[in-house]
Amino acid sequence: MGVMLDTIGQLIAGYLQKEVPGYEPFTPSDPEHLRGVVEPGDVLLVEGNNRISGIIKYLTQSTWSHAALYVGPIDGAAEPDGEPHVLIEANIGEGVTSAPLSKYFPYHTRLCRPVGLSYEDRTTVCRYAINRIGFGYDTKNIVDLARYLVPLPVPQRWRRRMIAFGSGDPTKIICSALIAQAFDAVRYPILPKITRAASRKARREILHIRDSSLYMPRDFDISPYFEIVKPTIVHGFDYLSLHW
């Protein structure tokens, strides 16, 4: 039975990862500018072009379907041409893997940077993610995979739960959950729940960490604690020098 479930799961995962033909990014990345500004601890959001990307974008009502963490060159991980792997990501059917930055040059991307995070904590965040390379996605969990095959539409109040449904095993991680857990390791907020102390003498906001499995790629975009870094203007921009 286990072999059969695993086979069915792999077939579903393969179907979900197939690219949708005709994808053209509205605003493609500028590779050289991106490579020149990205720093360890930055979160790279991606507008994907496979079947699961379209479903995630619908469920999250967002442009972004995937997130990867930039950690800098990883020892022993490189492309055949020598380009180092610098990203950690979790993909359905693959689990937690590393990748070169060039993987996402053809895509529409956004760079999100944690504000005020110390060098030591950045290092901890990156090391947390690197140590999880090899964590898998359990293709035997058909229910977990089938959530992406549910006919649309899905009521709005269920959409975030649809992303997290079936999760629970700490070694089976989706992309945004992996990154959320890495920042949780240093208690850096993304989109915490906020409550207010009842006492008048203690009027202050109290932040509560959300379940990491409920995070979506777009949460890094809308988080008040992450800066949006636009590579083409970060070092200055002269609109008069443009020819258009």
Segments (PLM) and residue ranges:
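Cysteine-nucleophile amide-bond enzymes
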Residues: 1-244
